[in-house]
Amino acid sequence: MNIENEKNVEIKVAGIGKTANNALNEIIKAVEADFVAVSEKQENLDLSEAGIKILVAEDFEKKIQKALENTDMLFILAETDEAENVKISTAVAKIAQSLDILTISIIAAPSEAEFAKTGKAELKQFADIVITVPTEKISEEINKIFIKNIKVIEDIIRERGIVNLDFADVNSMLKNGGTAVLGYGTAAGENKEEVVVKQVLNEILEKSIKNARKILMNILAGPEIGLDELSKITRILEKELETDEASIVWAYAMKPDMEGTVSITLIATDFS
């Protein structure tokens, strides 16, 4: 594996509408990517710190296509608070699909029902992955949720550990994955492997992972964790699945400052 190439995977984050435009100003500080702000209102763009700003107008699609040139992975962020946001997200995802860009849409909505009304089915036709952030069920700020979701995938690609996944691995797992859910967990002490998996599963609010056929996982742990413990985590996770066809792919990085602790981030997709 060429580590330098993995660092140079071209990632872009597009924020659609006022809420996502505002979120970009925080995400810029936390994520290694290029940023595109898209809005129907010039005043939203004027407040954005994104390097590329695109007003939804007659030449919108041409500008999006140019902005997405030479991109490997695209995150599309939006909230359903503005009626056209999901439609605009779909237009961006369609262009990304035509350029063979791995496209992950993260949409904040009060509920799945609300998201469905604003065009989830149409978006799923063009985005490889669609993640719903159920704003009625969470207390965290939307900005932090967006960052957390992006970092799960970015860290798997960019962070170098003992067991590494590269962009090709991530692309094969997420391409045409459909609906996806994410979970996070950290545990220490006895039985931490069981505890951390339970935490991850409890964190997932939108959907059970039981029918997921693809699971991408990033594990961080202290130096005492060995192959037996890593295999145990995978076995515990496999017991939660109802299909024998599931593929679980994971990366592992050892952190000296995490002695006695294990942390997992997980994305499950390709639901049967």
Residue spans of the language-model regions?
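Tubulin/FtsZ superfamily GTPase core signature
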Residues: 1-272
